[in-house]
Design a protein with these regions (language model features):
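Surface-exposed, charged secondary-structure patches
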Residues: 2-35, 134-180
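Short Pro/Gly-enriched beta-strand edge/turn motifs at strand-loop
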Residues: 3-6, 129-132, 185-190
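Core segments of small alpha/beta cavity-forming domains
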Residues: 1, 65-135
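Short beta-strand edge/turn micro-motifs at domain boundaries
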Residues: 15-21, 29-91, 154-160, 182, ...
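Residue-level marker of positions within ordered structural domains that often coincide
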Residues: 98, 164, 212
Length: 233
């Protein structure tokens, strides 16, 4: 469930369409973390529709935006004057998810909870798979048409992007590969398990890109990861 109370809404000053609004929810009474919502409006006569949701990390520092009466300018995937364009940053973050510390872009990004949690999950699964001579592989791909950008008052960009991934796991020694989470179980249903399972995910990642000349690193500030298909191979 997405929290309904709004802490801040960043409205674009751009006069044309399509346009996006970034909305930040409050922390709920049961301590659900804040969400960053991206809502799209394709034309003046259409309603805004929810495009993506990212769960903000504990203690995440978001950039500042112009006050609501002024709004903020929407950015573009090729924005210049940054340590990397939004398109480059998203592509490099996908590479970082794929290759971890061995990624050639590892030094460009600050540590974040999404990579930390994903790494722990992968290690836990690996322990079980390796004991039976099984294998696992995750492939991450940035979606060029799935990037939303809002300029911040310090000259940086807040970017929300879709990064798809496919997680293939093969159990060894005649064993069955089973879902790795309740969300995967719900999609797998009553499918007959085989030695290999393939789960496709949509990962929505929010990141801040500092202006050029800054010593700061690109910083992921929130993420949401959900499986969309889980099937036996």
């Amino acid at each position: 469930t997405i929290p309904s109370d709004i802490m801040q809404t960043v409205i674009p000053t751009d006069s044309g369409w399509p346009r996006s609004v970034f909305t930040i929810t409050t922390t709920t009474s049961d301590q659900q973390s804040k969400r960053l919502l991206v809502l799209d409006q394709n034309s003046a006569r259409e309603n805004f529709k929810l495009w993506g949701v990212a769960r903000l990390f504990p203690g995440a520092q978001l950039p500042k935006f112009q006050v609501p009466s002024i709004g903020s300018q929407m950015g573009q995937v090729n924005d210049s004057g940054l340590v990397a364009t939004p398109a480059q940053a998203v592509q490099r973050y996908a590479d970082l998810l794929q290759n971890g510390a061995s990624s050639k872009y590892a030094d460009e990004f600050g540590a974040d909870y999404f990579r930390q949690d994903l790494g722990k999950l992968t290690e836990t699964v690996q322990e079980g798979i390796a004991a039976n001579n099984g294998t696992q592989q995750q492939v991450f791909s940035a979606q060029a048409d799935g990037i939303k950008v809002m300029r911040s008052s310090d000259g940086g960009d807040l970017v929300v992007a879709q990064i798809n991934s496919v997680w293939t796991r093969t159990a060894g020694e005649g064993r069955e590969s089973l879902p790795a989470s309740d969300a995967e179980k719900a999609l797998f249903g009553t499918t007959t398990a085989t030695s290999t399972i393939k789960a496709s995910y949509v990962n929505v990642v929010a990141m801040y890109i500092p202006p050029a000349g800054s010593d700061a690193k690109i910083q992921a500030v929130g993420a949401e990861r959900q499986p969309i298909t889980v099937e036996a191979q």
